[in-house]
C-alpha cells in the first residue's frame, strides 16, 4: 500500500516537473 502511494507521488512530481519545464520553454520562446 505504501509503495503505491510512493509511486503516485513520484509520478505526480515527474509530471509537475515536465509541465514546469514545458511552460518554462514556452515562456522563453515568447520573449
UniProtKB/Swiss-Prot annotation:
The keyword Methyltransferase does not apply. The chain crosses the membrane at residues 3-23. It comes from the Eukaryota. It is found in: Plastid, Chloroplast thylakoid membrane. One of its GO terms (molecular function) is electron transporter, transferring electrons within cytochrome b6/f complex of photosystem II activity. GO terms for cellular component: chloroplast thylakoid membrane; cytochrome b6f complex. InterPro entries: Cyt_b6/f_cplx_su6. Its main location: plastid. It is a single-pass membrane protein. Keywords: Chloroplast, Electron transport, Membrane, Photosynthesis, Plastid, Thylakoid, Transmembrane, Transmembrane helix, Transport. One of its GO terms (biological process) is photosynthesis. The keyword tRNA processing does not apply. Disulfide bonds: none annotated. Component of the cytochrome b6-f complex, which mediates electron transfer between photosystem II (PSII) and photosystem I (PSI), cyclic electron flow around PSI, and state transitions. PetL is important for photoautotrophic growth as well as for electron transfer efficiency and stability of the cytochrome b6-f complex. The 4 large subunits of the cytochrome b6-f complex are cytochrome b6, subunit IV (17 kDa polypeptide, PetD), cytochrome f and the Rieske protein, while the 4 small subunits are PetG, PetL, PetM and PetN. The complex functions as a dimer. HAMAP family: Cytb6_f_PetL. Belongs to the PetL family. This is Cytochrome b6-f complex subunit 6. It comes from Guillardia theta (Cryptophyte). The lineage of its organism: Eukaryota, Cryptophyceae, Pyrenomonadales, Geminigeraceae, Guillardia. The gene is petL.
Amino acid at each position: 500500500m505504501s509503495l503505491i502511494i510512493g509511486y503516485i507521488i513520484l509520478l505526480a512530481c515527474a509530471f509537475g516537473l515536465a509541465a514546469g519545464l514545458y511552460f518554462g520553454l514556452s515562456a522563453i520562446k515568447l520573449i
